[in-house]
Amino acid sequence: MNLVPMVVDQTPRGERAYDIFSRLLKERVVFLTGPIEDGMASLIVAQLLFLEAENPDKDIFMYINSPGGVVTAGLSIYDTMQYIKPSVSTVCVGQAASAASLILASGAEGKRFALPHSRVMVHQPSGGVRGQATDMEIHVKEILQLKRMINEIYQKHTGETIKKIETLLERDTFLSPEEAKKVGIIDDIITQRKENSGKQE
């Protein structure tokens, strides 16, 4: 059983208790953790849309610790990040693998980060198909189309050539933060907050 810590806020109307994730959502912090599937993706999309409605001009901060998951679920998060007006800053804590690495790379330019001991893994989409030969052929075509689409997304956000991206994604490729920065998946490695980062403007 997962226990979610509660925090108490002091307000003019008295004390109010929040679970820790809801409290951080008030500060425009979104957590993308665990396997990426449709239910989880819907929760992330809903939070992004809510924060845009709250303030379309203020950045959103997404902390990522995920092994990846369903490609289409990951793409729904990606498309929403590109669709909304606020910039989304992405931070890898722990790991960003598969679809999660694509989301990490698609953060706002100059605002994509990783902590020093995090790991990034990229690869091409995969799928197990069984059934009639014709159905298998249809699914193979779809996977190849997804592969081209994902390569183009990485190319757009990293600035690398399609040929370099294809080579990088051909097999499971594990990257240190330094290597992820070199290929353009992140912009910088962060070890500590800036001294004034917690102060109100």
Swiss-Prot record:
SUPFAM superfamilies per record: ClpP/crotonase (SSF52096)
UniProt cross-references to InterPro entries, sorted A to Z: ClpP, ClpP/crotonase-like_dom_sf, ClpP/TepA, ClpP_His_AS, ClpP_Ser_AS
Pfam families: CLP_protease
One GO process term, biological-process aspect: protein quality control for misfolded or incompletely synthesized proteins
Catalytic activity line of the entry: Hydrolysis of proteins to small peptides in the presence of ATP and magnesium. alpha-casein is the usual test substrate. In the absence of ATP, only oligopeptides shorter than five residues are hydrolyzed (such as succinyl-Leu-Tyr-|-NHMec, and Leu-Tyr-Leu-|-Tyr-Trp, in which cleavage of the -Tyr-|-Leu- and -Tyr-|-Trp bonds also occurs)
Keywords: Cytoplasm, Hydrolase, Protease, Serine protease
Active site: S98 (nucleophile), H123
Record CDD domains: S14_ClpP_2
Role description: Cleaves peptides in various proteins in a process that requires ATP hydrolysis. Has a chymotrypsin-like activity. Plays a major role in the degradation of misfolded proteins.
Assembly notes: Fourteen ClpP subunits assemble into 2 heptameric rings which stack back to back to give a disk-like structure with a central cavity, resembling the structure of eukaryotic proteasomes.
Name by which UniProt lists this protein: ATP-dependent Clp protease proteolytic subunit
Species per Swiss-Prot/TrEMBL record: Neorickettsia sennetsu (strain ATCC VR-367 / Miyayama) (Ehrlichia sennetsu)
Lineage, uppermost ranks: Bacteria, Pseudomonadati, Pseudomonadota, Alphaproteobacteria, Rickettsiales
Gene that this polypeptide is encoded by: clpP
